[in-house]
């Protein structure tokens, strides 16, 4: 990898920090505003230079189409906020990679998901925890799953009967989510296989 100029390093650091804080890369306009460029075109030129040096990949056709290549991508990807209608493991959802041995979990974990909310509190899955997830659609009733209903991603206990799925919380303050498979888009994204208390590991 070629050495970066001071300005290129500033652009790279901004992209990395923006992904870390928001879960997605910045737009060209945001880069220009933050670093005092005259226009988004100036930001684009710096991005092209970074791409030539092999530290980022520019994904055409997307305003936030920037992927970091210099990051240490060993370990499990951590998924933060998930944008509506986009794949769970889309690059812009990945906050970082953490050196957690996937084989610590059975079955082995494929990614970590940052938990949002307290609906699974009573089985020890708390707001802000990192949920280890095995990517599969082969799940059974009674298992805790990561599911997508329409454009919402949730962690719940699965109960399926016929064309109806109930997603059960583990907290009496929350109501079950009932899904009619004939009328709603429903996908199993994975099986919960463990929890890392945020701050204890990463």
Curated annotation (Swiss-Prot):
State any single GO MF term: DNA binding
Q: Does the keyword Transcription regulation apply?
A: yes
InterPro entries noted in UniProt: LexA, LexA-like, LexA/Signal_pep-like_sf, LexA_DNA-bd_dom, LexA_repressor, Peptidase_S24_LexA, Peptidase_S24_S26A/B/C, WH-like_DNA-bd_sf
- The EC number(s) attached to this protein equal 3.4.21.88
Keywords in UniProt for this one? Autocatalytic cleavage, DNA damage, DNA repair, DNA replication, DNA-binding, Hydrolase, Repressor, SOS response, Transcription, Transcription regulation
Q: Which residues bind DNA?
A: 28-48
Positions bearing the site annotation: Cleavage: 84-85
Q: Which Gene3D superfamilies match?
A: Umud Fragment, subunit A, Winged helix-like DNA-binding domain superfamily/Winged helix DNA-binding domain
Family to which the UniProt record says this protein belongs:
Belongs to the peptidase S24 family.
| Listed PANTHER family | LEXA REPRESSOR, LEXA REPRESSOR-RELATED
Quaternary organization: Homodimer.
Q: What is this protein called?
A: LexA repressor
Please name the source species.
Serratia proteamaculans (strain 568)
Taxonomy of origin reads: Bacteria, Pseudomonadati, Pseudomonadota, Gammaproteobacteria, Enterobacterales
